[in-house]
Curated annotation (Swiss-Prot):
Organism superkingdom: Bacteria
Swiss-Prot/TrEMBL GO biological process terms: 'de novo' pyrimidine nucleobase biosynthetic process; 'de novo' UMP biosynthetic process; amino acid metabolic process
Family the entry assigns: Belongs to the aspartate/ornithine carbamoyltransferase superfamily. ATCase family.
Protein's UniProt keywords contain Transferase: yes
Gene, per the UniProt record: pyrB
Name by which UniProt lists this protein: Aspartate carbamoyltransferase catalytic subunit
């Protein structure tokens, strides 16, 4: 097994195609573990993982917890709301104390962009970015890549329409960085106030017309309307948003008949996506969740078990 020649997973912008391929290949090899009657192997026995979340999470936090446990690691879950952070302890001090307890890897989600990079420089332990501010969400990007590869068999030449609030979406950024490395044609669509900026150099096309992005799309990635990160006035109302930019069955028919429908979750049904689309035959949303466990198992294996940093 080839080695992952890095200590930390901080983003996909600087990750090579070879590294991404290694992670996806490893995830595919480990994926069936989650479906076995006994979901446990001793690969990471004796290793300790801490998940440290300063923002709410269900899928990412719990899939990392399961990934570690399936591989035999000891896993502790720390929520900022119930930790010494409430007493004024800094992020760096919290992580250093965890390392002093023998933690081998820290999974961090934080509202501040660059927080995982700060920890990576301060710790000997591996740091995995589980989402930092408006920066990146690399493990979501990797599980999206795995889902597309398994369903489509390729990336090059695919038209991928990313619909919704890309401005506030770290998922969109990681998806863009990964997909464009493989030659996919990426479109962003949504209100002009919610479109990510500065991706022209990556070959990304933007439009305020959802229909233009969906026309002939092979993959449709719908993004959540992140009201908690927004200022007022970025769009009229939630109802108006759904009317003009929501992905409905009628709009999805503009994509290719075999188009893949994805969403990083959590869903706002009736806002960015209709229930008929979310639960329809083209939806791979639950498959993404399954692949999330596999990708996170692969990263833990490569960082702590079979892929020691060079």
């Amino acid at each position: 097994m080839a080695r992952l020649k890095r200590k930390d997973i901080l983003g996909l912008r600087d990750m090579t195609v070879e590294e991404i391929d290694l992670i996806l290949d490893t995830a595919e090899a480990l994926k069936d573990l989650a479906t076995r009657p006994i979901k446990k192997v001793p690969t990471l026995r004796g290793k300790a993982l801490a998940t440290l979340f300063y923002e709410p999470s269900t899928r990412t936090a719990k899939s990392f917890e399961l990934a570690g446990k399936y591989l035999g690691a000891d896993v502790i879950t720390i929520s900022a709301s119930t930790s010494s952070v409430q007493k004024g302890e800094t992020l760096k001090d919290t992580a250093r104390n965890l390392e002093a307890m023998g933690i081998d890897a820290v999974v961090l989600r934080h509202s501040m962009g660059g927080a995982p990079h700060l920890l990576a420089r301060a710790l000997r332990a591996s740091v995995i970015n589980a989402g930092d501010g408006l920066h990146e969400h690399p493990t979501q990007g990797l599980l999206d890549m795995l889902t597309i590869r398994q369903r489509k068999g390729r990336f090059k030449g695919l038209k991928v329409a990313i619909i919704g609030d890309s401005y506030h979406s770290r998922v969109a950024r990681s998806d863009i960085f990964a997909l464009t490395k493989y030659g996919a044609e990426v479109w962003l669509a949504g209100p002009s106030t919610l479109l990510a900026r500065g991706f022209e150099e990556w070959g990304v096309r933007t439009t305020t017309r959802v229909e233009e992005a969906l026309e002939g799309a092979d993959v449709v990635i719908v993004l959540r309307l992140q009201l908690e990160r927004q200022q007022k006035g970025l769009f009229p109302t939630v109802a108006e948003y759904h009317r003009f930019w929501g992905v409905t069955p009628e709009r999805l028919r503009l994509a290719r008949p075999d188009a893949l429908l994805m969403h990083p979750g959590p869903l706002n049904r009736g806002v960015e996506i209709s229930t008929a689309v979310a639960d329809g035959p083209q939806s791979a949303i639950l498959e993404q969740v399954t692949n999330g466990v596999a990708v996170r198992m692969a990263l833990l294996y490569l960082l702590l078990g079979g892929g020691e940093a060079a």
